[in-house]
Structure formats: structure tokens, C-alpha cells
Amino acid sequence: MSAAGRPVVVTGASSGIGRATALAFAALGHPIVLGARRVERCEETAQEIRRAGGTASSVALDLRETDSIVAFAEAAVAALGRVDVLVSCAGDVLPETVVGTPPEDFAAQVQINLLGAQHLVSLIAPQMIERREGDLVLVTSDVVRSPRPTMASYVSSKWGLEGLARALQMELEGTGVRASIVRPGPTLTGMGMEWPAEVLGPVLDEWKRWGLVRHAGYLSAEAVAQAVVTVATQPPGTHLTLVEVEPEAPVRPPREPS
């Protein structure tokens, strides 16, 4: 499944990992549909791809709205003819706790990070199953392995997304359609980084208290995108079910001889 030209849909493509993933696939010759709420940002990236000789279009996608998800799926298929690769990168994170967060706010995060992804997969996957070929790549987070306080809805929904992916892997076995998880560690994107200092500072202090900050290294969005591409371009007969990507610790200077 490594041949160039497989039509690819990327959600959350307005910035960060999603944008980097769209650019990485486009550089290999794949036609792309980019989706996100900030569709104008997606269109800027689509124009960049087209200027480089690629094929790309942007479509508005709001994972909070059922009608938007359905319209996006229909538009993506219309633009590409078919979808061979669906990459679910869309996500949102707010500094929320279990106790004290209004249920409707908690539910909104779960809708974006989990339920919206399930809806889109349910619309795209049947065509893949019928053709006996396709890749569904779900980008989760290392919070599944190392939950963080003050991110309760994000942790819950990413755990759910991995559970969905695992169930999907069993459902799809023998169909020629692969469902895969890419689980990145801390990544230098806008998500969470734009929190005000008075919010981010106490959050980081809490993570340190729980031993969740080992070093100051961060992944680039491009590094995670390469992992996504690697997963989706494996040859038939090979299935990377879970790929974890973590930042390497900054290299320390050698110790002076005592």
C-alpha cells in the first residue's frame, strides 16, 4: 500500500500534526483533502501544496456537528473519487478536571476527540471494506499511557479513541483495511501551548509533582507526520497496529573527568 497517488483525507489539518501530515503525504504525490473548523487555514496549506505541483482541496469540518461531518465525508469522496487513507488528527484540549467541569463542557471535548472521529470513520470505512483496501490512522496521545491531571476530558477521550481503534482492528481483520494508532508524546504545536501563563504554569507544576515531566524535549509536528506516513505506506501483509513516538531527551554535554 505504498504506491503514490492514494487519495488521503486528513482532519485537524489547519495546524500542527494534521497540517504536517497533509504536507508529508502531498510531498509523496498523494492527492489530499484537508478538513478542520478553521477552513481558511486549511486552504492556505492546500494552496501551498498546489503551488508545489500537488493536488489538494480544503473542506470545512466541525466534529461537534453531525451535519458538518456528513457533508465533509461526502465532499471528500466527491473531490477525490475515493478515500484510501483517513488520518484522524483533529483534537482539542482544555485545562479541565473531573470535579468542577460542567458536564456539557466535558462532553464537548469528548465529542471532538472521540465521537466525531467514530462518526467519520463509520462514513468512510464501508467504501474501503467494499474495495478490500484502505488505511484508518487514529492519532492519539501518550496520555493514554501516562494520564495527566488537569486534562481530564482529553485523557478520557484519547483513551476512548484507542479503545475504538482496538475494536476497529478486530472488526476489520481480514477485510484488507488496516486501523492503526499513532501515539505521540509531547509535541510542539499550538494545542495547549497557547494557554495563558497563569494557567500553564500551575499545570506544569502539577505534572512535575506526579513525575510526568522527565526532560524538556518536544517532538516536532513533522516527526509525528512521518510516523503517520510510515504506518499508512506499509506494503500489503504488514500492519503497524501501534506506533509510539517520543521526544529524545536533549543531549547533555559530556562530564568533565574528575
Model-identified regions with their sequence ranges:
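The beta1-alpha1 cofactor-binding region of Rossmann-like NAD(H)/NADP(H)-dependent oxidoreductases
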Residues: V39, A60-A71, P103
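Active-site helix of classical SDR
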Residues: V121, S157
